[in-house]
Amino acid sequence: MLRYQIFPLSVSHIKNMFFKKHPKKFFSPEEQERIVEEIRKAEDRTSGEIRVHLDCCAREIPVEKAKRVFHKLGMTETKARNGVLIYLATEDRKFAILGDEGIHRVVPENYWEDVKEKMQKQFREDRVCEGICLGIREIGEKLKTYFPVEKDDRNELPDTISEEK
């Protein structure tokens, strides 16, 4: 299921983007660490894999860019096809939540809608890091219902924030 939405950015985030061009600079080192820790915690409860990808601008429909990033990051290579990507285009102020086909074989069509709305609420309040962390927690909770941790579970994808080079 593909979802994307426009989110507002504060003056401080816009200044950071202007002076720090690289997407990874969008979050402070502390915020980056917090996001990675949320990914690890969420993945401790599910066999699913969660990635966060930052891009300055989608240069196209965000969902289409997210699909390409999803493939580029190898997210279609997980054993159960249960990866989820949070794609964030910082300059365009848009994001997408993209789940792999293994997830969408077993979940309802509007599965990510509540996650999107909760994240967007945080973004509107200039809490972008909290919005991402909340999204990761919510995704982890949802995934554990259909994809609990397996006995032989291993981390199939890096627990890092990727960014457009």
Can you say where each PLM-predicted feature lies in the sequence?
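A structural boundary signal for the start of the first folded domain, especially the loop/turn
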Residues: 1-83, 88-165
